Amino acid sequence: MSGIVMMIIAIVVLGGAYLLYGRYLQNKWGIDPKAKTPAYEMEDGVDYVPADTNVVFGHQFASIAGAGPINGPIQAAIFGWLPVMLWILIGGVFFGAVQDFASMYASVKNKGRTIGYIIEAYIGKLGKKLFLLFCWLFCILVVAAFADVVAGTFNGFVTDNAGTVTKVVANGAVATTSMLFIIEAVGLGFFLKYSKFNKWINTAVAILLLVLAIVLGLKFPVYVSLGTWHIIIFAYILVASVAPVWALLQPRDYLNSYLLIFMIVGAVIGVFAANPSCNLKAFTSFNVDGQYMFPILFVTIACGAVSGFHSLVSSGTASKQIKNEKNMLPVSFGAMLMESMLAIIALIAVASFADGEAAAQGLTTQPQIFAGAIANFLSVIGLPHSLVFTLINLAVSAFALTSLDSVARVGRLSFQEFFLDSDTDEENMSPFLKVVTNKYFATIITLVLAYLLTKVGYAEIWPLFGSANQLLSVLALVACAVFLKKTKRQGCMLWIPMVFMMAVTFTALGMTISKLTKALFTTGLDLGNTLQLIFAVLLLILGVLVAIQGVKKLFEKNDEKQTA
């Protein structure tokens, strides 16, 4: 199958899904364009800030779409292009987009609260506590990992085996561009908030700033060491995760969303221009080097089809910015389908290389393979290969930073909500509760632990990220299914995704526990394996406990309707 045919199939399926299935869900759940959203009802100028659809879409899209939809399909391609493509399209439409839409809808109908609050309101306090504790720890792990990855991407120096220190121009350019994005985003935030111009002028200004940042970044690379970047990045996150969303988060993600969209559009043009052939087998085997297609393929592709992290963004930050309930469809459902399109492009990219060709060209990481393929495609229409390769790499590297403060903000909110129940009197709290629910305290303790994890080695437990991420998806689907049932809305479309993701996640965790247990008995105690085993067991117990509570509520015979 050629790249063009794969692209056309994806465009038809994803576009048709938005127009048909997305609107079907909108009608079934009863979207009310006249209802007052939490962005207005709870407006505080910090987290609850109403924003235009394109701005919130930019935040949602830039937060959920980073390296994930590129890395996942390329790694999963060992099973062949057909199962990867089928899961991206089927999973993206019926699993990921439904989860993201349902998470945002449930949040908007509950004052913009997170999935943790939804669990408390419709399942129980114990489930809420377990979920929020898991979310908080998950966010600490992600912040630690992403901060280290970003610092590594920005690192201006590399030392060879002989001890010679060399400047890395590409990293310096990415660093300059990313820092300029932040500076420009602050200015754009004030411009969007206080200007009276229409959205087209605002868009033009955003694109001009985007181009300016890229040009200056390529022209004036900045060289800073890895350790210094760690400090700078955590200082930035500290400010960004408590700053009003209109001042940085909204405009920065708005800028980056255009960069991401331009990359996708350029890639689509490249595919149609080059019409790359597919050099991958349609299907290889259910077992590739000891990796079983079920559940590995579904855990590995993750963001390109369904990711639990998306539910945290949908219910944690984006839901607090929705101006009108009708905007939820393009912001949540639409952003997920756009991410699935990016995943299909990544699959076409890796399939365009013959066996061993990418490695022969020095393309060893997934982003490099993606950038190299797109550069090859666009060179057909005369665009310089080296320039396109640099720009694609720059774009992919910049997106990790966009997710950082969103994750930190969600972590902060999870920590605060852990100590706040729905019946808590926030005006008459104890001194202890006032401290632990303070946004600055919650942010500092979250980031201090993430920084320490960065230094002591998050890599010991990072292999569990895929399973932990999909466990979040299970819990989000359970919470949303119970919410829809308790409020007398149709939620059967969540049941199959919920059961399937339970099977995927619990199987993956079970296989991991079995493998690690055998390793401990054969090789003895090992810090990495021991930590992974402990966390895997805890994740499995947590998932089973919350899932059992949720399933009980789904089958509970109670005709009393809860309002939302």
Task: Identify the meaning behind each predicted range.
Residues 271-285, 337-373, 406:
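Extracellular/periplasmic helix-exit of transmembrane alpha-helices
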Residues 189-194, 208-231, 239-241, 246, ...:
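Hydrophobic alpha-helical segments and their helix-loop junctions in multi-pass secondary transporters
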Residues 125-140, 334-340, 388, 417-455:
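Loop-to-transmembrane helix boundary motifs in multi-pass membrane proteins
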Residues 67-74, 91-99, 103, 107-111, ...:
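Membrane-helix boundary/coupling elements in multi-pass transport proteins
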Residues 51-110, 121-125, 142, 147-156, ...:
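Membrane-interface helix-loop-helix modules in multi-pass membrane proteins
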Residues 14-38, 60, 90-116, 193, ...:
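Juxtamembrane transmembrane-helix boundary signature
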Residues 16-70, 257, 321:
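Membrane-interface "cap" regions at the ends of multi-pass membrane proteins
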Residues 2-19, 76-107, 116, 175-181, ...:
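Extracellular loop-to-transmembrane helix junctions
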